């Protein structure tokens, strides 16, 4: 995981290429669907409704993989809370309670990386905002006592090597 634009998607593609089970980011799917219906930034327009849909989809991702040795997620369930915190949005306690039920064996986090950061139709945040989101993500995992392993700003191959060393 990590803030926006840190190389998560490329890392997931690299792990998948090596034969690992991977669950891709689903925010783009929700955002693109909303854009087809005339809503440019669904998360900004209705963060709670967006988060409810996202929670359901991420919980489904998590629940379907329980019989695999390793599955890598582009993003975790807990990050829904991090994004709501980033926007200072009040949310139902149910969101937080649902995230407490999810435990990952490892959380690998990618740091903000200005040199590779770029905006697109689903990534609206500035680089500075992406740093704050990264901090919120770190905070939510720490709050829930979930250990995070920091990955370096380096090639996908070196990041994968660090991950494989950590899980073996």
Task: Kindly label every feature range from the protein language model.
Residues 7:
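Conserved glycine(s) of the Walker
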Residues 16-57:
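Conserved substrate/cofactor phosphate-moiety recognition/catalytic segment
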Residues 88-155:
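A glycine- and Lys/Arg-enriched "phosphate-lid" helix/loop adjacent to the NTP-binding pocket
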Residues 162-167:
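C-terminal alpha-helix
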């Amino acid at each position: 995981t990590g803030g926006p634009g840190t190389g998560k998607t490329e890392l997931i593609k690299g792990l998948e290429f090596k034969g690992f089970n991977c669950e891709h980011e689903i925010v783009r799917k929700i955002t693109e669907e909303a854009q087809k219906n005339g809503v440019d930034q669904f998360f900004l327009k209705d963060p709670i409704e967006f988060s409810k849909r996202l929670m359901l989809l991420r919980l489904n991702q998590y629940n379907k993989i329980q019989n695999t040795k390793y599955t890598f997620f582009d993003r975790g369930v807990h990050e829904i809370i991090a994004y709501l915190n980033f926007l200072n949005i009040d949310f139902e306690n149910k969101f937080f309670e649902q995230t407490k039920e999810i435990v990952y064996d490892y959380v690998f986090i990618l740091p903000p990386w200005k040199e590779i950061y770029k905006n697109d139709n689903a990534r609206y945040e500035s680089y500075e905002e992406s740093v704050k989101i990264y901090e919120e993500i770190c905070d939510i995992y720490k709050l829930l006592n979930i250990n995070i392993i920091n990955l370096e700003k380096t090639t996908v191959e070196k990041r994968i090597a660090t991950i494989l060393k950590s899980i073996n």
